C-alpha cells in the first residue's frame, strides 16, 4: 500500500483502523472506509463485504440494482437467516452438519460459484477441523469423477453449489454425478 501511495496511486482501504487507516487518511486521493473493530475477519464478513460491494457500485464496477431489487435481496437474506438459524430455523443446517461429521467434504461448484465454494471450504478447514476441498465443474476431470464414484461413501460428504444461471452442460454433469455417485451425505445448496 505504501508503494502504491508513493507512486501516486489511489487506494481504497477497508479496515477497523490501525496502520492502514493512518496511511490512507494521510493521502487526499485515497479513501478509507471503517468497519467495526474487535471482530475476527470471518465474523466481520457482512461489514467487509458490504463496504466492498458499495465501492464497486459507486465506481461502476458492478451495476447497482435499483431500490426495489435491493429490498428483494434484503428480504431473501432475512428469510435465509431465519430458515437457517440453528436454534429456531427449519433444521436443515443441523441435518447437513450432522451428516458431515467425521467425513472429508467435497464441494462441487460451477465456475460462476467456485469463489464461494473455495471460501466455504476454507471456512470449514479453519473453523471445523475437517478436510474440505472445492472442485470446479466442468473442469473436474475424469480421474476425479472416478475417485468420487469409487470412494467409500461413509468417508466423505458432497455439497453441490448450484444456481439458476449455470450452463446447461454443467447442469447435466451435476445431475449425472447426483444420479451415479452413491453417497448418503450429498446436499445441493441453491445459491
Question: Predicted segments — roles?
Answer:
Residues 32-34, 132-134, 158-160, 186-190:
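Conserved beta-strand scaffold positions in the cores of enzyme catalytic domains, especially
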Residues 154-164:
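Active-site pocket-lining segment
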Residues 39, 57-155:
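Active-site phosphate/pyrophosphate-binding segments
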Residues 1-82, 98, 163-171, 175-185:
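Glycine-rich phosphate-binding loops that contact phosphosugars or nucleotide phosphates
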Residues 14-17, 110, 137, 163, ...:
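Fold-independent oxyanion-binding glycine-rich loops
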Residues 11, 32, 105-106, 158:
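Short, well-ordered beta-strand core segments
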Residues 112, 127, 176-181, 188-191:
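Intrinsic structural disorder
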Amino acid at each position: 500500500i505504501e508503494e502504491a501511495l508513493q507512486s501516486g496511486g489511489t487506494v481504497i482501504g477497508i479496515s477497523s483502523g490501525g496502520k492502514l487507516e493512518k496511511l490512507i487518511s494521510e493521502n487526499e486521493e485515497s479513501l478509507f472506509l471503517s468497519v467495526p473493530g474487535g471482530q475476527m475477519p470471518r465474523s466481520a464478513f457482512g461489514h467487509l463485504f458490504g463496504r466492498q460491494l458499495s465501492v464497486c457500485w459507486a465506481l461502476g464496477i458492478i451495476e447497482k440494482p435499483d431500490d426495489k431489487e435491493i429490498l428483494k435481496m434484503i428480504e431473501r437474506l432475512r428469510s435465509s437467516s431465519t430458515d437457517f438459524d440453528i436454534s429456531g430455523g427449519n433444521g436443515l443446517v443441523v441435518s447437513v452438519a450432522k451428516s458431515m461429521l467425521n467425513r472429508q467434504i467435497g464441494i462441487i461448484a460451477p465456475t460462476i460459484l467456485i469463489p464461494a465454494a473455495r471460501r466455504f471450504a476454507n471456512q470449514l478447514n479453519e473453523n471445523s477441523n475437517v478436510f474440505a476441498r472445492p472442485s470446479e465443474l466442468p473442469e473436474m476431470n475424469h480421474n476425479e469423477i472416478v475417485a468420487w464414484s469409487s470412494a467409500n461413501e461413509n468417508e466423505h460428504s458432497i455439497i453441490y453449489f448450484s444456481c439458476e444461471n449455470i450452463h446447461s452442460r454443467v447442469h447435466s454433469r451435476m445431475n449425472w454425478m447426483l444420479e451415479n455417485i452413491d453417497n448418503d451425505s450429498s446436499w445441493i445448496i441453491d445459491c
